[in-house]
Protein backbone atom coordinates (compact mmCIF):
# COMPACT_ATOMS: atom_id res chain seq x y z
CA UNK A 1 0.00 0.00 0.00
CA UNK A 2 1.41 3.42 -0.96
CA UNK A 3 1.02 6.27 1.52
CA UNK A 4 1.25 9.91 0.54
CA UNK A 5 4.37 11.69 1.72
CA UNK A 6 4.33 15.10 3.41
CA UNK A 7 5.28 18.06 1.24
CA UNK A 8 8.88 19.25 1.33
CA UNK A 9 9.93 22.44 3.08
CA UNK A 10 10.15 25.32 0.63
CA UNK A 11 12.95 27.87 0.80
CA UNK A 12 12.79 31.17 -1.04
CA UNK A 13 9.96 31.63 -3.53
CA UNK A 14 7.62 28.63 -3.48
CA UNK A 15 7.20 26.90 -6.81
CA UNK A 16 3.60 26.71 -8.02
CA UNK A 17 2.62 23.14 -8.84
CA UNK A 18 -0.81 23.00 -10.47
CA UNK A 19 -0.35 19.29 -11.06
CA UNK A 20 2.09 16.81 -9.50
CA UNK A 21 5.54 16.99 -11.00
CA UNK A 22 5.01 20.16 -13.08
CA UNK A 23 6.07 23.73 -12.28
CA UNK A 24 4.15 26.76 -13.51
CA UNK A 25 5.74 29.75 -15.20
CA UNK A 26 9.07 30.09 -16.98
CA UNK A 27 11.83 27.68 -16.11
CA UNK A 28 14.57 29.31 -14.05
CA UNK A 29 18.04 27.78 -13.96
CA UNK A 30 19.42 27.26 -10.46
CA UNK A 31 23.18 27.26 -10.00
CA UNK A 32 24.01 24.44 -7.58
CA UNK A 33 27.49 24.21 -6.03
CA UNK A 34 28.61 20.99 -4.35
CA UNK A 35 31.57 19.75 -2.30
CA UNK A 36 32.25 17.00 0.21
CA UNK A 37 35.06 15.63 2.34
CA UNK A 38 36.40 18.83 3.87
CA UNK A 39 37.59 16.80 6.88
CA UNK A 40 37.86 19.73 9.28
CA UNK A 41 39.93 18.81 12.33
CA UNK A 42 40.35 20.21 15.83
CA UNK A 43 43.30 22.30 14.66
CA UNK A 44 41.73 23.39 11.36
CA UNK A 45 40.93 27.09 11.65
CA UNK A 46 40.05 29.38 8.79
CA UNK A 47 40.93 26.81 6.15
CA UNK A 48 37.63 27.16 4.30
CA UNK A 49 36.82 30.84 4.76
CA UNK A 50 37.52 31.53 1.09
CA UNK A 51 35.31 28.65 -0.04
CA UNK A 52 32.27 29.84 1.89
CA UNK A 53 32.82 33.53 1.06
CA UNK A 54 33.36 32.90 -2.65
CA UNK A 55 30.70 30.32 -3.43
CA UNK A 56 27.85 32.84 -3.17
CA UNK A 57 29.27 34.73 -6.14
CA UNK A 58 28.99 31.69 -8.40
CA UNK A 59 26.05 29.66 -7.10
CA UNK A 60 22.53 29.97 -5.69
CA UNK A 61 22.69 26.90 -3.42
CA UNK A 62 25.54 24.96 -1.78
CA UNK A 63 25.35 21.17 -1.30
CA UNK A 64 27.57 19.65 1.40
CA UNK A 65 28.12 15.94 0.75
CA UNK A 66 29.37 14.65 4.10
CA UNK A 67 32.67 13.99 5.85
CA UNK A 68 32.79 17.66 6.72
CA UNK A 69 34.78 16.75 9.86
CA UNK A 70 37.43 14.16 10.71
CA UNK A 71 35.71 12.39 13.60
CA UNK A 72 32.43 14.19 14.29
CA UNK A 73 33.84 15.86 17.40
CA UNK A 74 32.17 19.00 18.71
CA UNK A 75 35.33 21.19 18.43
CA UNK A 76 35.69 20.11 14.79
CA UNK A 77 32.12 21.13 14.02
CA UNK A 78 32.69 24.46 15.78
CA UNK A 79 35.74 25.10 13.59
CA UNK A 80 33.69 24.27 10.50
CA UNK A 81 30.87 26.57 11.56
CA UNK A 82 33.27 29.47 12.11
CA UNK A 83 33.94 29.41 8.36
CA UNK A 84 30.53 28.23 7.23
CA UNK A 85 28.79 31.28 8.76
CA UNK A 86 30.32 33.34 5.93
CA UNK A 87 28.17 31.54 3.33
CA UNK A 88 25.47 33.84 1.93
CA UNK A 89 23.37 31.28 0.04
CA UNK A 90 21.10 28.42 1.18
CA UNK A 91 22.91 25.24 2.17
CA UNK A 92 21.71 21.64 2.01
CA UNK A 93 23.75 18.81 3.50
CA UNK A 94 24.16 15.18 4.49
CA UNK A 95 26.40 13.53 7.04
CA UNK A 96 29.27 11.22 6.10
CA UNK A 97 30.71 8.18 7.82
CA UNK A 98 33.29 10.36 9.62
CA UNK A 99 30.51 12.27 11.38
CA UNK A 100 29.47 8.95 12.95
CA UNK A 101 32.89 8.04 14.35
CA UNK A 102 32.41 9.69 17.76
CA UNK A 103 28.92 8.30 18.18
CA UNK A 104 27.10 11.63 18.12
CA UNK A 105 25.81 12.10 14.56
CA UNK A 106 22.55 13.56 15.86
CA UNK A 107 24.46 16.30 17.68
CA UNK A 108 26.54 17.07 14.59
CA UNK A 109 23.36 17.27 12.52
CA UNK A 110 21.74 19.54 15.12
CA UNK A 111 24.72 21.92 15.15
CA UNK A 112 24.71 22.14 11.36
CA UNK A 113 20.94 22.66 11.29
CA UNK A 114 21.18 25.42 13.89
CA UNK A 115 23.77 27.10 11.65
CA UNK A 116 21.31 27.12 8.75
CA UNK A 117 22.19 23.94 6.86
CA UNK A 118 19.09 22.00 5.75
CA UNK A 119 20.11 18.45 6.68
CA UNK A 120 18.78 15.59 4.57
CA UNK A 121 18.09 12.27 6.22
CA UNK A 122 14.87 11.15 4.64
CA UNK A 123 13.66 14.75 4.31
CA UNK A 124 13.27 16.91 1.22
CA UNK A 125 13.52 20.61 0.50
CA UNK A 126 12.55 22.83 -2.39
CA UNK A 127 14.58 25.88 -3.38
CA UNK A 128 13.32 28.12 -6.18
CA UNK A 129 11.55 25.30 -7.98
CA UNK A 130 14.31 22.69 -7.62
CA UNK A 131 13.93 19.79 -5.20
CA UNK A 132 16.68 18.48 -2.94
CA UNK A 133 16.51 14.98 -1.51
CA UNK A 134 18.85 12.29 -0.22
CA UNK A 135 20.82 11.13 2.80
CA UNK A 136 24.14 9.61 3.75
CA UNK A 137 23.49 6.38 1.90
CA UNK A 138 25.40 3.21 2.67
CA UNK A 139 27.90 0.73 1.33
CA UNK A 140 27.53 -2.83 0.03
CA UNK A 141 28.99 -2.99 -3.47
CA UNK A 142 27.88 -2.59 -7.05
CA UNK A 143 26.06 -4.66 -9.66
CA UNK A 144 26.55 -8.41 -9.45
CA UNK A 145 29.16 -7.88 -6.74
CA UNK A 146 26.65 -6.26 -4.39
CA UNK A 147 26.43 -8.04 -1.05
CA UNK A 148 23.21 -10.06 -0.68
CA UNK A 149 21.20 -10.92 2.40
CA UNK A 150 22.33 -14.52 2.76
CA UNK A 151 24.11 -16.52 5.41
CA UNK A 152 25.17 -15.17 8.79
CA UNK A 153 22.91 -12.93 10.83
CA UNK A 154 25.60 -10.23 10.85
CA UNK A 155 25.61 -10.17 7.04
CA UNK A 156 21.81 -9.92 6.93
CA UNK A 157 21.92 -7.07 9.46
CA UNK A 158 24.49 -5.24 7.35
CA UNK A 159 22.43 -5.62 4.16
CA UNK A 160 19.26 -4.59 5.97
CA UNK A 161 20.95 -1.33 6.99
CA UNK A 162 21.74 -0.67 3.32
CA UNK A 163 18.14 -1.41 2.34
CA UNK A 164 16.79 0.92 5.03
CA UNK A 165 19.07 3.74 3.90
CA UNK A 166 17.94 3.27 0.29
CA UNK A 167 14.32 3.34 1.46
CA UNK A 168 14.91 6.59 3.35
CA UNK A 169 16.39 8.15 0.22
CA UNK A 170 13.41 6.96 -1.83
CA UNK A 171 10.99 8.45 0.69
CA UNK A 172 12.71 11.82 0.41
CA UNK A 173 12.61 11.77 -3.41
CA UNK A 174 8.94 10.79 -3.31
CA UNK A 175 8.12 13.90 -1.27
CA UNK A 176 9.14 16.18 -4.12
CA UNK A 177 6.72 17.53 -6.73
CA UNK A 178 9.32 19.45 -8.74
CA UNK A 179 10.24 18.49 -12.29
CA UNK A 180 13.93 19.03 -11.45
CA UNK A 181 15.60 17.50 -8.40
CA UNK A 182 19.09 17.03 -7.00
CA UNK A 183 19.95 13.97 -4.89
CA UNK A 184 22.69 14.44 -2.27
CA UNK A 185 24.58 11.42 -0.95
CA UNK A 186 27.85 10.70 0.79
CA UNK A 187 28.37 7.17 -0.55
CA UNK A 188 28.40 6.60 -4.30
CA UNK A 189 25.40 5.02 -6.07
CA UNK A 190 27.50 3.89 -9.06
CA UNK A 191 30.83 2.17 -9.58
CA UNK A 192 31.89 4.70 -12.25
CA UNK A 193 32.87 7.36 -9.73
CA UNK A 194 34.86 5.06 -7.42
CA UNK A 195 37.15 3.72 -10.16
CA UNK A 196 40.66 4.70 -9.22
CA UNK A 197 40.22 3.43 -5.69
CA UNK A 198 41.57 -0.08 -4.99
CA UNK A 199 38.99 -2.58 -6.32
CA UNK A 200 39.22 -4.46 -3.02
CA UNK A 201 37.47 -1.57 -1.22
CA UNK A 202 34.81 -0.71 -3.82
CA UNK A 203 32.17 -2.43 -1.71
CA UNK A 204 32.93 0.04 1.10
CA UNK A 205 32.48 3.09 -1.12
CA UNK A 206 28.82 2.79 -2.07
CA UNK A 207 25.99 0.63 -3.32
CA UNK A 208 23.95 0.08 -6.48
CA UNK A 209 20.83 -0.05 -4.35
CA UNK A 210 20.81 3.74 -4.30
CA UNK A 211 21.08 3.97 -8.10
CA UNK A 212 18.20 1.52 -8.47
CA UNK A 213 16.13 3.79 -6.24
CA UNK A 214 17.10 6.95 -8.13
CA UNK A 215 16.27 5.38 -11.50
CA UNK A 216 12.67 4.87 -10.44
CA UNK A 217 12.07 8.64 -10.62
CA UNK A 218 12.02 10.77 -13.77
CA UNK A 219 12.52 14.10 -11.99
CA UNK A 220 16.08 13.50 -10.73
CA UNK A 221 18.37 15.82 -12.71
CA UNK A 222 21.67 14.92 -11.09
CA UNK A 223 23.30 13.19 -8.13
CA UNK A 224 26.25 14.49 -6.10
CA UNK A 225 28.29 12.49 -3.59
CA UNK A 226 31.68 12.37 -1.88
CA UNK A 227 33.63 9.70 0.04
CA UNK A 228 35.78 8.27 -2.80
CA UNK A 229 38.89 10.48 -2.58
CA UNK A 230 40.66 8.77 -5.46
CA UNK A 231 37.61 8.13 -7.60
CA UNK A 232 36.46 9.63 -10.88
CA UNK A 233 34.62 12.97 -11.13
CA UNK A 234 31.71 11.76 -13.28
CA UNK A 235 29.51 8.76 -13.93
CA UNK A 236 25.87 7.88 -14.55
CA UNK A 237 23.13 5.54 -13.38
CA UNK A 238 21.81 2.78 -15.64
CA UNK A 239 19.10 5.15 -16.92
CA UNK A 240 21.62 7.91 -17.56
CA UNK A 241 21.16 10.21 -14.57
CA UNK A 242 24.47 12.12 -14.19
CA UNK A 243 26.43 11.30 -11.02
CA UNK A 244 29.23 13.57 -9.81
CA UNK A 245 31.90 12.79 -7.22
CA UNK A 246 32.53 16.11 -5.47
CA UNK A 247 34.92 14.88 -2.78
CA UNK A 248 37.42 17.72 -2.33
CA UNK A 249 40.46 15.58 -3.26
CA UNK A 250 38.76 14.78 -6.58
CA UNK A 251 37.87 18.43 -7.20
CA UNK A 252 41.51 19.38 -6.70
CA UNK A 253 42.40 17.27 -9.74
CA UNK A 254 40.04 19.39 -11.87
CA UNK A 255 41.39 22.84 -11.03
CA UNK A 256 41.53 25.51 -8.38
CA UNK A 257 37.89 25.64 -7.29
CA UNK A 258 37.05 23.90 -3.99
CA UNK A 259 33.54 23.15 -5.27
CA UNK A 260 31.82 22.32 -8.54
CA UNK A 261 28.87 24.27 -9.95
CA UNK A 262 26.00 22.74 -11.95
CA UNK A 263 23.14 24.43 -13.79
CA UNK A 264 19.89 22.70 -12.87
Indicate residue ranges for each PLM-predicted region.
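N-terminal active-site segment of His-dependent metallophosphoesterases
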Residues: 1-90, 100-103, 155, 159, ...
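Binuclear metal-dependent phosphoesterase catalytic core
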Residues: 2-29, 126, 208-221, 229-264
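Active-site-proximal beta-strand elements of phosphoester/diester hydrolases
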Residues: 29-39, 129-141, 182-184, 242-248
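Active-site neighborhood of phospho(di)ester-bond hydrolases with catalytic His/Asp-centered motifs
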Residues: 34-36, 62-67, 91-97, 118-123, ...
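Metal-dependent catalytic neighborhoods of phosphoester/phosphodiester hydrolases
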Residues: 43-48, 68-85, 95, 100-115, ...
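Active-site-proximal segments of metal-dependent phosphoesterases and phosphodiesterases across multiple
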Residues: 80, 147-149, 176-219
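Hydrophobic alpha-helical segments and helix pairs
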Residues: 102, 108-140
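Binuclear metal-dependent hydrolase catalytic cores centered on His/Asp/Glu-rich metal-binding motifs
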Residues: 115, 130-178, 203-208
Amino acid sequence: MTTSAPPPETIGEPAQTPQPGMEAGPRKTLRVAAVGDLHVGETTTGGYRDLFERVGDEADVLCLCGDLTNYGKTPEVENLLADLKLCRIPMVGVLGNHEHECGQPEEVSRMLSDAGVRMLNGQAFEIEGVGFAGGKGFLGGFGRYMLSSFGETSVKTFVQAAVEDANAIENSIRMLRTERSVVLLHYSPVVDTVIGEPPEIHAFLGSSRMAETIDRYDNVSLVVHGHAHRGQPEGATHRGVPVYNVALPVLKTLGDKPYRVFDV
